């Protein structure tokens, strides 16, 4: 989206669309935005917080609200809808091809659980945090559903494009209200929003890896920081990995196909974690019956937990399986490349935590680490202490 937004800053939209479809241009912009986000992250969390806050408002919330309002105004003033709200309103889920794209819906909610790290900063978290999650999920549904309708209304079905439709939709609406001069402005805003989003993902996970490394799970090389305490080596390695992954642009047939395969890989990795979360929540009801739970699903018994956790697990499992199937709506090129990228990506990412956990060394532990031990490690320490005393 960042590359497309920058391409659409110009006023010659046919040329803008050609530029946005150029794989090498997109590769260059992706790397520029990512490394810019990396260098901003090296400035510390204060910089990250400021850019993310402003970018989230200017590049996400305001454009989303504007898009929905433009769609309402367009229909209210007699604009022609390119979207059929009758016979073809509901997709044909009997076709696997449609289910594959539907599986991407899980990505809309990805990261909702990340707010849990701030739960200690919330007043009365046992009540207010679940409320915040439900409200956030509702807002997400409203924005994505209404935003998608707004794009479907103004763009003919044959012209729908995974990477360009948002900018094309805004451009068409601005032409309708005779305000085409707003197109470059919204393109700049969206590009800034992309930078803010990338910045959040660059800084957040690397901070978590840094905390794990200081607990003795990574060599001292990964624990090195700059003058203000930012995990510089992890950020550089992370950037190098993204750079290598971006080279997929060269082997994929189009920008759309590259976007789709990365989206599918992201969905698959998220769903693996969600399946572990749902199954883990059920298992802990039996393995840690007496654990204190400020928030509990179901007042008594485990029936409601089985229902909610089971539905979540089954839905995630179905989407997980479907995500490996190439969609027919988008040319993904050689199926061998498609499956190879997905399977190798999953194997590497899933294997990494096990390798890191098995590699822990006492000599790697930073004395100032605040990393909490795993509960089974605490149990083992207690057992060893009791055995020694006996």
Walk through the language-model features, giving the residues of each.
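Membrane-interface loop-to-helix entry segments
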Residues: 25-77, 110, 133-139, 263, ...
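TM-loop-TM module centered on a large, flexible mid-protein loop between adjacent transmembrane helices
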Residues: 2-11, 132-199, 218-266
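Alpha-helical transmembrane segments and their membrane-interface junctions
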Residues: 241-253, 315-332
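Terminal cytosolic tails of multi-pass membrane transporters
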Residues: 278-307, 326-390
């Amino acid at each position: 989206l960042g590359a497309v937004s920058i391409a659409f800053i110009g006023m010659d939209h046919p040329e803008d669309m050609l530029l946005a479809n150029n794989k090498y241009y997109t590769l260059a912009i992706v790397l520029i935005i990512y490394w810019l986000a990396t260098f901003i992250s090296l400035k510390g969390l204060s910089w990250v917080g400021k850019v993310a806050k402003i970018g989230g408002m200017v590049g996400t919330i305001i454009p989303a609200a504007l898009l929905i309002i433009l769609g309402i105004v367009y229909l209210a003033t007699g604009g022609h809808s390119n979207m059929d709200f009758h016979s073809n309103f509901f997709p044909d889920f009997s076709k696997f091809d449609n289910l594959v794209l539907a599986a991407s819906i899980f990505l809309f909610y990805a990261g909702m659980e990340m707010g849990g790290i701030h739960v200690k900063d919330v007043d009365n978290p046992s009540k207010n945090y679940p409320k915040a999650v439900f409200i956030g999920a509702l807002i997400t549904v409203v924005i994505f559903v209404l935003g998608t309708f707004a794009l479907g209304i103004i763009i003919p079905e044959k012209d729908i494009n995974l990477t360009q439709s948002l900018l094309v939709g805004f451009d068409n609406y601005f032409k309708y209200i005779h305000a085409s001069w707003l197109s470059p402005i919204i393109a700049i805003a969206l590009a800034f929003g992309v930078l803010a989003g990338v910045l959040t993902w660059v800084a957040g996970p690397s901070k978590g890896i840094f905390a794990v490394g200081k607990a003795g799970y990574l060599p001292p090389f990964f624990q090195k920081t700059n003058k203000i305490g930012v995990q510089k080596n992890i950020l550089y390695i992370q950037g190098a990995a993204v750079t290598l992954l971006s080279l997929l642009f060269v082997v994929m047939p189009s920008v759309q196909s590259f976007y789709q395969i990365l989206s599918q890989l992201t969905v698959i990795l998220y769903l693996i974690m969600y399946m572990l979360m749902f199954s883990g929540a059920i298992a802990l009801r039996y393995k840690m019956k007496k654990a204190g739970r400020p928030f509990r699903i179901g007042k008594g018994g485990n029936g409601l937990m089985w229902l909610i956790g089971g539905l979540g697990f089954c839905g995630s499992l179905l989407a997980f399986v479907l995500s490996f199937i190439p969609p027919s709506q988008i040319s993904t090129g050689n199926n061998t490349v498609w499956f190879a990228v997905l399977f190798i990506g999953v194997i590497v990412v899933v294997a990494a935590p096990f390798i890191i956990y098995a590699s822990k060394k006492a000599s790697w532990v930073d004395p100032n680490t605040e990393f909490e031990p795993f509960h089974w490690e605490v149990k083992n320490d207690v057992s060893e202490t009791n055995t020694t005393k006996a």
